[in-house]
């Protein structure tokens, strides 16, 4: 029997009918009340046993339940449930077209649920399934994941979906030829080729010249390039870095700003994005989780904020999330991401009613999956302008200002036990500093000790003490930002004796990228955030940049009005 409307008779949309599944289970529906029922009526066949009542559809009972909303796709989490979901997707894939919008919606819902499980161990399988069922948008997302993570999965972690080793050589070549493949070094492409060939060396070694033609000759050092010349590597330009540094907000020209700037490592320059923040902000927190940028707290210059925003790189629209539990200012360096959740500690809470500013000892955590902030255990000390970082599965919170004095204390938060404990104090009290994990070392960078801004770098040693590194910043700076990027420690902008535009790089790791210097940021600023944005290059390039020369230029001057309390009062 063909499953299409036979048009042998007309069923009034106001009448009750029954949808009959392939398993012969009956579902009473009112066509006038259900768009999906009307779609099933259009594609189903009238039962010859009851021409006025029964509509036979080409779907199993489980699929009909999903379509009629009797069961939720998201409730299927066990092995049998996943089998049923895949079966339902197979059944409705051919009908999930624009002429059946509700069925198409269910097809996308099922694909979304399947995509939520995307990981290193199933990415190739999911990509194959999405292509098989003509789910183009979801196939594109799995391909994006594969291209970004391929070298890491195969070369670094050595843990990848077994379907990778089953790919035909043409697909392997297509993947490795892409501009979007994310590599730290081009030699990783060679190792990916070696691993795929090794899975069936006897039959695949003959494909080596074909695959080696995807290696970018210009991205190899001279010795390696010479050894591979027999394979005729590609003369295309080196692949561009997928991860970029972004600067979020900050104090600019005596006021908070709404700018996003990003660093282009291939051209060694900073660019100003067309994308703006939802409001002007400084001394705020920001984080990227699963590719989404979150923005929270801080100050507009007139008011301490508690709002949380998120930015979709598909629509470039800011959406409001659940507010923080309390307004928090001076949290530029005291928020971190751990296990997919955002933690923030301390800060200053300005009380609108009493018109007083109170330093905070509280902490809170935001879960993007539930869109909620919840309390954490409290710090022992009140502190704003402190710094936090994840190190060895714990969160270190150091230094800061309690409203009366600068602190040297360090507290360690255990996210699993939700408890703080004290550890060894810093060598001296410090605030407005940076704390970061670079090269698997926990480092204190810069800051203000109450008398002068520091250019020293201190390293936490596992013997239980802070040790000074011989390397130093060129400028002592506070209320700056720092991060680990492409094997270097980056120190960006901040406050010296004036607001800075300069950037410094130091402490290169063995395989660090080659930078001779890092140019100044487009405008001097402090109280900013700097983040490594994984796989954001394409997003930012598509969004577009602003030509700085065409922007209104203000006179340069010392911008001490935007410095933190400890920066301008000591």
From Swiss-Prot:
Transmembrane region(s): none
Q: Which GO terms describe its biological process?
A: proteasome-mediated ubiquitin-dependent protein catabolic process
**GO MF annotations, alphabetized:** actin binding; ubiquitin-like ligase-substrate adaptor activity
SMART domains linked to this entry: BACK, Kelch
Going by the UniProt record, its keywords in alphabetical order are: Actin-binding, Cytoplasm, Cytoskeleton, Kelch repeat, Repeat
Q: Where are the Kelch repeats?
A: 244-291, 293-338, 341-393, 395-440, 442-487, 489-535
Q: Found in which tissues?
A: Testis, in both spermatogonial cells and spermatocytes.
A single Gene Ontology CC annotation of this entry is: cytoplasm
Compartment(s) of residence: Cytoplasm, Cytoskeleton
Where is coiled-coil annotated? none
Alphabetical list of PANTHER family matching this protein: KELCH-LIKE PROTEIN 32 (PTHR45632:SF3), LD33804P (PTHR45632)
Q: What does this protein do?
A: May play a role in the spermatocyte cytoskeleton, possibly interacting with actin.
Name of the protein in its database record: Spermatocyte protein spe-26
